[in-house]
Amino acid sequence: MSAKPYRLAFTSGGLLAREAIVATPIYIRVHDWALVRAEIDADNLLQARTISSGRRTSRELVQRLSTLSEAEVELVVDATSSERGHMMWAAACRRYELIGDFAEEVMREKFLLLNPVLIPRDFDAFVRSKALWRAELESTTDSTMRKLRTNLFLMLREAGFVSDDGHIVASGLSQRVANVLAARTPSDIRFFPVVDVEAGKAAR
């Protein structure tokens, strides 16, 4: 059975953590992501410069947030800036398997092997290896792939996982974030630069 094609729509926007501050309280009130998006678009709550860009951003935001459980959405509402970034990183990894695979197979693997440098060429090599079995990667234009790579590394920096000089930074997960990530099977801690024993300490 062939693998489900990678979604490749994360060409801009970063983590959308600031935008999540707007959307999640609305969801707590209405409990319907379609209504959340409609309210955001109707009142331009994301303060987009154009209607079309606002709609694109709200669609992307809702698609990512909809991967979170009710408890996780409530956590985002009450989160610190760091916690919100971590939850939005988890949401991006869930929404986009390519991001999740890169996080687990490249970033976390490098971190665990004490190889602390993560650079754009690592993403290029990762994509080339996946393209052997993924036709959608083989057919993606160089321009689109550059946009994907640029936005992925923007997300990594916004989440605090990669420094400006390309070094992987250990993720200091809070207790409650570690708890919700570890509650999934398999654990979503696999998407973070943290060793399991550290995550276990945070979860207690």
Identify the meaning behind each predicted range.
Residues 1-86:
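Eukaryotic partner-binding/assembly regions in large regulatory complexes
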Residues 9, 17, 26, 97-98, ...:
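Leucine-rich, amphipathic alpha-helical/linker segments
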Residues 12-16, 31-33, 94-100, 126-130:
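Helix-boundary capping/turn motifs
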Residues 20, 99-100, 120, 149:
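Short, leucine-enriched amphipathic alpha-helices that occur as contiguous helical runs
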Residues 29-31, 115-118:
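Short capping segments at the starts of secondary-structure elements
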Residues 87-90, 94-117:
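Positively charged, polyanion-binding regions of nucleic-acid-associated proteins
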Residues 119-135:
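DNA-recognition alpha helix
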Residues 138-204:
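Accessory, usually C-terminal, subdomains that scaffold auxiliary metal cofactors
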